[in-house]
């Protein structure tokens, strides 16, 4: 290989590495948590689209952020009663199956948050149901799992296929503790990272990745990009994409 070709190859390799290392955008609540909004998040090129899952009284898995919607508690209502509810955009509250079906038509990663439930038994049941459905639908390679529940995180790590990214949201565990538990990284609130900025380097030194949520202020976006966090979860993915172009 002559010198010119070697220089071109080196430049391409450096560019590829820079692209790979750039902070990636995750749309909070799927831009906003319906099959239609998932497609929107995909259309603007987000790395991932985050959505929240509950297990209903009859074990049906449904997608919704809050524990109660239109006076119907997610955990204590039947699934059909929940999926019959209309959302503000006119879509019905989706089942997990409906949401994942829409996900088949996307390229974006599916970032599933299992909400903390009333007891560990229900969380384990939810983890088992989620993993079975994801496998049936052929989406195992597209999924990442996040949760505030330490028990649910451990269950995802125990039961999901080896190498599946699982992250913890609650914020009290250090990168070293997360590594020991088998987590892929930390997924912490902006306030936690501001309090412990050293955790970014500690996590990277341990081979873990760092996601920060929910970041909507431009100055916070800039600071996190400068700190080289791996992912930023935001309600303003278009604004974040514009900021990333400046780096």
Describe the role of every protein-language-model region.
Residues 1-23:
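Bacterial Sec-dependent N-terminal signal peptides
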Residues 21-247:
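Phosphate-group recognition and catalysis centered on beta-loop-alpha active-site segments
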């Amino acid at each position: 290989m002559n010198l010119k070709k070697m220089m071109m190859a080196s430049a391409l390799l450096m560019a590829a590495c820079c692209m790979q290392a750039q902070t990636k955008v995750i749309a909070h609540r799927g831009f906003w948590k319906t099959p239609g909004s998932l497609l929107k998040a995909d259309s603007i090129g987000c790395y991932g689209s985050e959505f929240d899952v509950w297990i209903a009284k009859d074990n049906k898995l449904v997608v919704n952020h809050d524990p109660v919607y239109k006076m119907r508690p997610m955990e204590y209502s039947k699934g059909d009663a929940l999926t019959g509810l209309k959302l503000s955009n006119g879509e019905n509250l989706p089942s997990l199956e409906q949401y994942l079906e829409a996900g088949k038509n996307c390229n974006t990663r599916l970032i599933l948050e299992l909400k903390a439930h009333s007891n560990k038994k229900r969380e384990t049941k939810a983890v088992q149901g989620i993993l079975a459905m994801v496998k049936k639908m052929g989406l195992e390679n597209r999924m990442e799992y996040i949760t505030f529940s330490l028990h649910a995180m451990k269950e995802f790590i125990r039961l999901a296929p080896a190498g599946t990214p699982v992250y913890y949201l609650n914020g009290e565990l250090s990168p070293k503790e997360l590594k020991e538990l088998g987590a892929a990284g930390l997924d912490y609130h902006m306030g936690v990272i501001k309090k412990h900025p050293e955790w970014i380097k500690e996590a990277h030194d341990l081979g873990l990745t760092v996601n920060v949520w929910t970041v909507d202020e431009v100055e916070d976006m800039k600071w996190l990009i400068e700190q080289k966090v791996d992912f930023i979860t935001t309600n303003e993915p278009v604004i974040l994409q514009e900021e990333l172009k400046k780096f």
